[in-house]
């Protein structure tokens, strides 16, 4: 059964019993809440939700170190190729892409998608969420997003684990994230994208209480950076 590790912020690691390793939104080197060395991770696949620096993170280096495939939206993929990433497979909302050990389906996300290069902020297409089928389980990585009504349709995908941002300010906050948990109907909900920087300070236990009111059948698992969850 798959194991999900929260690296911190919105960066996650998925591993299965066959040795397949996937990294999602690998913001690691400059991530103030993690001690993980990005060189210690050996993914064959990197999944990206959008182009913001705190999600693209170490993608270019990790792809080179591991000869990893990067799966992302089209415009972000085009830009990554200009940065030297050799193996990019890009898609768009509604599309499903297979990778070693699983599949990733792009969903809508209400947010923006741009990269700050130190001088300019350049837009790279649209943001996305990801429905990831891996190790016999179905994960919903919402990415950075506001609440939206069509999350109810995502619930039709049979989500086992929903990973939802709760930080507010740049994404939905705890109240709307609890509604998202209700809409998606996942068995397990894991909060992310909080307590990395001052504007997104939140109490995950308060979020758990709100989910208990909205979706009492869901189990909220609060991880600390570096902690793993057995999705079996």
Predicted features and spans:
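Active-site environment of divalent metal-dependent phosphoester hydrolases
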Residues: 30-31, 52-57, 77-80, 95-98, ...
